[in-house]
């Protein structure tokens, strides 16, 4: 399989899982909302399988395709922790995360999600440019 098919297959599976979660459970596939409900003692019977699938999905992929991408993170642990906290803060401020707004929200033609996703993308490009990623 060509390396270009992996992102296409991933997008198809993301879309399929989003539609299935909405149709079968009436829930939006926003990871921050799902994890938030779990941490607040929500209904684990509906949310745990989705989170487990997020963790096991890449492992199943690596077994099936005999490929597991190597990831190198050059940042220090304090930087990673601060970045994670900032992402969490931004998620709360925007009433959702990239998966909730970018995948489920745009698919539902939500104006709030379209604006939020545009801001996510612009902020990401600005940050990458500021950090010198494009040099």
Curated annotation (Swiss-Prot):
* Entry's Gene Ontology cellular component terms: plasma membrane
Chief subcellular location equals membrane
Give the residue spans that cross the bilayer. Answer: 4-24, 45-65, 71-91, 114-134
Q: Which InterPro entries match?
A: Sulf_transp_TsuA/YedE (IPR007272)
Q: Which domain of life is it from?
A: Bacteria
Its keywords, alphabetically, are: Cell inner membrane, Cell membrane, Membrane, Transmembrane, Transmembrane helix, Transport
Q: Name one Pfam family in it.
A: Sulf_transp
Compartment list: Cell inner membrane
Briefly describe its induction: Repressed by BigR.
**Membrane topology note:** Multi-pass membrane protein
Q: Which family does it belong to?
A: Belongs to the TsuA/YedE (TC 9.B.102) family.
Anything further noted? Part of an operon that comprises bigR, blh, XF_0764 and XF_0765.
Protein name (database record): Probable transporter XF_0766
Task: Give the originating organism.
Answer: Xylella fastidiosa (strain 9a5c)
């Amino acid at each position: 399989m060509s390396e270009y098919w992996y992102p296409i297959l991933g997008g198809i599976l993301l879309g399929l899982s989003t539609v299935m979660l909405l149709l079968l459970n009436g829930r939006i596939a926003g990871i921050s909302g799902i994890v938030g409900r779990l941490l607040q003692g929500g209904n684990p019977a509906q949310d745990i399988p989705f989170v487990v699938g997020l963790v096991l999905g890449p492992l199943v992929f690596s077994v099936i395709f005999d490929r597991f991408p190597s990831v190198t993170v050059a940042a220090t642990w304090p930087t990673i922790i601060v970045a994670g906290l900032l992402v969490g803060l931004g998620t709360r401020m925007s009433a959702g995360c990239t998966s909730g707004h970018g995948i489920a929200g745009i698919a539902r033609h939500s104006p709030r999600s379209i604006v939020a996703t545009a801001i996510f993308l612009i902020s990401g490009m600005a940050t990458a440019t500021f950090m010198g990623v494009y040099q």
